[in-house]
Each structure stands twice: as structure tokens, then as C-alpha cells.
């Protein structure tokens, strides 16, 4: 059996980041969101999102009853740094790689649903993971944020340099 670990929303300007753990052959999965608070100024600089992602993966491993003899494929994104360390310490065999297939498809679909719960109408989906798809989603969401920047600030990844400048510029009289 193969376990896949992937993330969704790292480059999305609003919301937290989705983490999915999937058993490829059966489709069993665990999905949760690293909360938006982890991407605010102070917590983002401390990289607390790494611990948030690791916690979700650990819960997924318990839920799916992952065994040490299963192959594990984990996305290379930096949000998984602490998870990779945990996998090593726990004695799991794993490969860091680009994730595709069911984990990527299900994760992106669940993340789009999450964005809808934040109030974003019809967020563009990431299907092929192309630069154009990511750009289209980013600018669509930023147009939505610009409609009410102060009212939607709590949903933004304000730890990003982009938002430090964005909110500095929008607060000018």
C-alpha cells in the first residue's frame, strides 16, 4: 500500500493550507486545514505552520492505521519540513516527490470547497497545476479581497511580504 501526503493552498492568498493523507489503493483519506492564524505575521515568521501540518498528518496516520511497511510519498513543499523529520524519527520509509493522482485531485477539490466556506464565490480550481491556473486563482481571489480589504483582512495570509505591502498601501489616506 502507498500513503500520499500533499498540501493545497500554500500559494493561495486567503485561508489556511489544506493537508491530505490518502491511501492510494483504497482512497481512504484524512483531510484538515492548517488554520489561517498560522499564516499571520507572528506565527508565520516562526514557521508554526510546519507543526500544524505535522499534527494533521499524525492524526491521518492514526485514522488510516498506517503501518511502517507501507510506502509513503510526501510533497516537497516546505510546509512538510517538520513532517519529514517526524517520519524519519518514527522509522517510516518515504520518498519526497511531486504528488499527483487521487491525493492531488481530492485535495484540490476539498480545498476549493473550503474556499467557498470563506465566502469566495466560484474560486477557480487547480486541475493541471499549471502556472496559468495558479495565477488565475491568485488574481481572482485578490480581486475579491480588494472589494473589501479591511473586512477580509482576517482571511488573508498577512505574514506574507505581499500583504505587508498591500495593507500598508491600502491604509494610506
Predicted feature residues:
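RNase H-like, Mg2+-dependent phosphodiesterase core
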Residues: 1-173
